[in-house]
């Protein structure tokens, strides 16, 4: 390796190396290689018994090689004369090509005269190799001359950056910056050209990233240096200037290394982790488990597969133990890890039983399928865990920054330092989550972009903090405020880049499923905060809901940009507009009204039902968006995305911790109910229609009354909702997935029934009218009876069997019994509500208005309801199947990282 330090330029070149590092050299060399190869292969079968003679074809080929060599010599002479760098080396290389060309001409001519001579063929082959080596060296040398020219320009920029940093006054600073800008632009053009010619993808990415940093940070260095000159007493300005200067030095080194195709240590590490580690390990494991039974050896394969699996489980455990991973998700990941372990042992046992056989048995094939299914389930849980992190962390990403800036504007340095720690933790969390998303992604190009963006965000974090500290020291300084605004803009832009990059490597289906679940959690928290009169909790949680909704709208709208406009995109965008333009404003209005009412002294009454309705509409809006997005998915994709699970489940469908009565052939009982034959589905639909009639009667009855002071109405509504979920289960829909879920729902109904029985008997005890009293007690007995029946019928899975290895779905009788029991209970609840009201009126007439103080039962007519803001979509309309639209557009990291012109205005 030869290092040339002409004018302090670190130029590395090995004159003996013939490694081709650019596409241009390949293109120029290809025609000559083709011609020489064709000539060498002419009559290559060796000596022939045929009459010797001159080969016209060989002579023609020899002439074409000679002409190609002349063309290279002509271009080489021109390059050597015009080149400012490596002139002597180029002249020597041209002469070497000329010399080898003459030898090749002579050897080719002799071979053409006697193409059957192995000696002459050998001479020509050696001459051809020497010629190709000489031409390659000439082209590489010419290429390095271009690199040398780029490095000279890079040195000019490097010196200009140093002068800008060390400027002694503002006038000198302005002069240096004005001189530096055109030099940076010139370097950018040269580096961009070089970038396009580099063969190695890693070098191209390194060049693109370095160019981006250079273009972005030169104007920032000017601003930071200007601030240092105006406020030399503020240490934060100097620290910022030095940080930016260090980044620029790293960018200069990156351009130098990439141009010469010599990767730095950082770049090598970066490139080494270009793919998702966990995703790669899982993919590789799935390939390794398929082995020919004939060559299977337990001693060789068992330790290897177990070691690979434990490595995967270690990575999954790290994700499970991360601070943002929720408890239920952690349990699912642990369960899936145990399931994968068990599946591997079962698979190895089958391999041992099949060892030495030519073909795999059905049992072995089944074990392989089970193994891949378990790894797929683990992947799904890891993806969902990542989406939990993304949904929580990439939410209101500007809040820590705004709080930090506000403290800085007030000149409170102590607060700035406290909020700086919060801001730093927030930045670290974004970077950690981005890396987690990378680990489970198969999108290599997307992973590179995420990691580059995260690296730039990490470098920007201390600069933002220093800018805030500087503003806190000089809060009245206009320059300090402008400096803070500049870094605020840079931070927000970089966070957007990182957010979009993370969105690109994660599944929108997973994102929407997790977001829907998180919004449901937040809606419930909001309602609880309202009932507990927790103003801060209400305001904070409502803000999170607004942030999540805005994020969903942004992600879905961006996703629709990847599709051709049509019915599908119109449907999705219509759902997003409904959420943003109608639902969210109403929710915001209700939140503001609730906060205002609770904050007043004394607290003002408010319509809790209105708030709950507005909150529920937000959840429904998110769910409608998700339904619209999933319209074009195939059944296989829907299965993978867990569509219709509502994410109410608390464990995986294939978890080893799931009891046997919950799973058959790896499917939830609800999924099996969805597979019933059409004839049986029709019977269930008929029963459901009858149930809906009873539900309508209950709706009509409870809608008359204000439930704010009437626990009987509240309990009736709760029982109605749970019964609806149970009937939905029989149709393969709704939040209840397994038999245990239905049993749990039945227990909840029984508990509600017991509470209603207690309230009803209290009313009956005080009722002076014996007839009304007896009616009410009779209806209460019916509720107890039908709750017991419902509890028995809730075990609907009893009729689903696995016979002869095939799934036999015969759950229709149990399903219809369940619906009938729910229908009877619904009717009993309706009659109980009516009888309770009648008994209460008798009690009032006898005892006077004081009876209205009866605990938890106050009969007040409900005010007329407002018209619904959102027209609910029919279920049938959401199930329309259409063909898949165009695939997602490819995001080029080089293009994304090379958009520099936005900074020209600074």
Curated annotation (Swiss-Prot):
GO biological process terms held by the UniProt record: apical junction assembly; apoptotic process; axon regeneration; cell motility; cellular response to indole-3-methanol; epithelial cell-cell adhesion; establishment or maintenance of cell polarity; extrinsic apoptotic signaling pathway in absence of ligand
Region Disordered: start-end pairs: 864-894
Biological source species: Mus musculus
Function description: Associates with the cytoplasmic domain of a variety of cadherins. The association of catenins to cadherins produces a complex which is linked to the actin filament network, and which seems to be of primary importance for cadherins cell-adhesion properties. Can associate with both E- and N-cadherins. Originally believed to be a stable component of E-cadherin/catenin adhesion complexes and to mediate the linkage of cadherins to the actin cytoskeleton at adherens junctions.
Sequence position, cross-link Glycyl lysine isopeptide (Lys-Gly) (interchain with G-Cter in SUMO2): 57, 797
UniProt cross-references to PROSITE patterns, sorted A to Z: VINCULIN_1
Biased composition (Basic residues): 881-891
InterPro entries noted in UniProt: Alpha-catenin/vinculin-like_sf (IPR036723), Alpha_catenin (IPR001033), Vinculin/catenin (IPR006077), Vinculin_CS (IPR000633)
GO molecular function: actin filament binding; beta-catenin binding; cadherin binding; gamma-catenin binding; identical protein binding; structural molecule activity; vinculin binding
Tissue-wise expression: Expressed in cerebellum, heart, liver, small intestine, kidney and placenta (at protein level).
Organism lineage string: Eukaryota, Metazoa, Chordata, Craniata, Vertebrata
Residue span of region Involved in homodimerization: 2-228
Positions of the UniProt region annotated as Interaction with alpha-actinin: 325-394
UniProt-reported outcome of changing residue 436 to P: Mice bearing this mutation exhibit several retinal pigment epithelium (RPE) anomalies, including pigmentary abnormalities, focal thickening, elevated lesions, and decreased light-activated responses
GO cellular component, one term: catenin complex
Region of interest (Interaction with JUP and CTNNB1), ranges: 97-148
Annotated positions of the Phosphothreonine modification: 634, 645, 658
Subcellular location(s) per record: Cytoplasm, Cytoskeleton; Cell junction, Adherens junction; Cell membrane; Cell junction
Name listed for the protein in its UniProt record: Catenin alpha-1
Post-translational modification: Sumoylated. Phosphorylation seems to contribute to the strength of cell-cell adhesion rather than to the basic capacity for cell-cell adhesion.
SUPFAM superfamilies: alpha-catenin/vinculin-like
């Amino acid at each position: 390796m030869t290092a040339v330090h002409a004018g302090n330029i670190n130029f590395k070149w090995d004159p003996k190396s013939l490694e081709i590092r650019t596409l241009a050299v390949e293109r120029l060399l290809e025609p000559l290689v083709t011609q020489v190869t064709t000539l060498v292969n002419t009559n290559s079968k060796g000596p022939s018994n045929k009459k010797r003679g001159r080969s016209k074809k060989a002579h023609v080929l020899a002439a074409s090689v000679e002409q190609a060599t002349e063309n290279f010599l002509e271009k080489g002479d021109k390059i050597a004369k015009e080149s400012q760098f490596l002139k002597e080396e180029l002249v020597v290389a041209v002469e070497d090509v000329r010399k080898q060309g003459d030898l090749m001409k002579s050897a080719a001519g002799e071979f053409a005269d006697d193409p059957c001579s192995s000696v002459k063929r050998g001479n020509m082959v050696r001459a051809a190799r020497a010629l190709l080596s000489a031409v390659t060296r000439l082209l590489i040398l010419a290429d390095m001359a271009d690199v040398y020219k780029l490095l000279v320009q890079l040195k000019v920029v490097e010196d200009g950056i140093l002068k800008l940093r060390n400027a002694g006054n503002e006038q000198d600073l302005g002069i240096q910056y004005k001189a530096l800008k055109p030099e940076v632009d010139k370097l950018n053009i040269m580096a961009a050209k070089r970038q396009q010619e580099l063969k190695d993808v890693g070098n191209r990415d390194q060049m693109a990233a370095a160019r981006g940093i250079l273009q972005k940070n030169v104007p920032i260095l000017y601003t930071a240096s200007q601030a240092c000159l105006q406020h030399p007493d503020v240490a934060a300005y100097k620290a910022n200037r030095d940080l930016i200067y260090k980044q620029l030095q790293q960018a200069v080194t990156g351009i130098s290394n990439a141009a010469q195709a010599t990767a730095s240590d950082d770049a090598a590490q970066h490139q080494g982790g270009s793919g998702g580690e966990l995703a790669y390990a899982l993919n590789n494991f799935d390939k390794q488990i398929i082995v020919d039974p004939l060559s299977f050896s337990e001693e060789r394969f068992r330790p290897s597969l177990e070691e690979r699996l434990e490595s995967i489980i270690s990575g999954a455990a790290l994700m499970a133990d991360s601070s943002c991973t929720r408890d239920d998700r952690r349990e699912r990941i642990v369960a899936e890890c145990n399931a994968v372990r068990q599946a591997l042992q079962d698979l190895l046992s089958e391999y041992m039983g099949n060892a030495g056989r030519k073909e795999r048995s059905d049992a072995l094939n089944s074990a392989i399928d089970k193994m891949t299914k378990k790894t797929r389930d683990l992947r799904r849980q890891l993806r969902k865990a990542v989406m939990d992190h993304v949904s929580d962390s990439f939410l209101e990403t500007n809040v820590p920054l705004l709080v930090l800036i506000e403290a800085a504007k007030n000149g409170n340095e102590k607060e700035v330092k406290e909020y700086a720690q919060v801001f730093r933790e927030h930045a670290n969390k974004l970077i950690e989550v981005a890396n987690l998303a990378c680990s489970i992604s198969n999108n290599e190009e997307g992973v590179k972009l995420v990691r580059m963006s995260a690296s730039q965000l990490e470098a920007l974090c201390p600069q933002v903090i220093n800018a805030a500290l500087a503003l806190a020291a000089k809060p009245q300084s206009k320059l300090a405020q402008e400096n803070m605004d500049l870094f605020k803009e840079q931070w927000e832009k970089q966070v957007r880049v990182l957010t979009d990059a993370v969105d690109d490597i994660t599944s929108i289906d997973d994102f929407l499923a997790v977001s829907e679940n998180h919004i449901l959690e937040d809606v419930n928290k909001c309602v609880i905060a309202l009932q507990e009169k927790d103003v801060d909790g209400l305001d904070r949680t409502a803000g999170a809901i607004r942030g999540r909704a805005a994020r969903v709208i942004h992600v879905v709208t961006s996703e629709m940009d990847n599709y051709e406009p049509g019915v599908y995109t119109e449907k999705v965008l219509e759902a997003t507009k409904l959420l943003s333009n109608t639902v969210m404003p109403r929710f915001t209005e209700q939140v503001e009204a609730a906060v205002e009412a609770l904050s007043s002294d004394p607290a003002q009454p408010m319509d809790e039902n209105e708030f709950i309705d507005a909150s529920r509409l937000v959840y429904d809006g998110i769910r409608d968006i998700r339904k619209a997005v999933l319209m074009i998915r195939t059944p296989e994709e829907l299965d993978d995305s867990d569509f219709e699970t509502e994410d109410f489940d608390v464990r995986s469908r294939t978890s080893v911790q799931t009891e046997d009565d919950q799973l058959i052939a790896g499917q939830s009982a609800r999924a099996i109910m969805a597979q019933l034959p059409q004839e049986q589905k029709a019977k269930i639909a008929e029963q459901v229609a009858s149930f809906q009639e009873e539900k309508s009667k209950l709706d009509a009855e409870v809608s008359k009354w204000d439930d704010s002071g009437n626990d009987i109405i509240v309990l009736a509504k709760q029982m109605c909702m749970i019964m609806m979920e149970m009937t939905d289960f029989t149709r393969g829909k709704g939040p209840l997935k397994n038999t245990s879920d239905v049993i749990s729902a039945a227990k909840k109904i029984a508990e509600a029934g017991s509470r209603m029985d207690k309230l009803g008997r209290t009313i009956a005890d005080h009722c002076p009218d014996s007839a009304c009293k007896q009616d009410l007690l009779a209806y209460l007995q019916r509720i107890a009876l039908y709750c017991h029946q419902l509890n028995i019928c809730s075990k609907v899975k009893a009729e689903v069997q696995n016979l002869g290895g095939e799934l036999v779905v015969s759950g229709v009788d149990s399903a219809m019994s369940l619906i009938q029991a729910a229908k009877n209970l619904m009717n009993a609840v309706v009659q109980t509500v009516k009888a309770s009201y009648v008994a209460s009126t008798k009690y009032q007439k006898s005892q006077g208005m004081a009876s209205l103080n009866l605990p938890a039962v106050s009969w007040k007519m409900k005010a007329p309801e407002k018209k619904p803001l959102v027209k609910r979509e029919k279920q049938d309309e959401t199930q329309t199947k259409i063909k898949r639209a165009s695939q997602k557009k490819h995001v080029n990291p080089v293009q994304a990282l090379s958009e520099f012109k936005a900074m020209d205005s600074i």
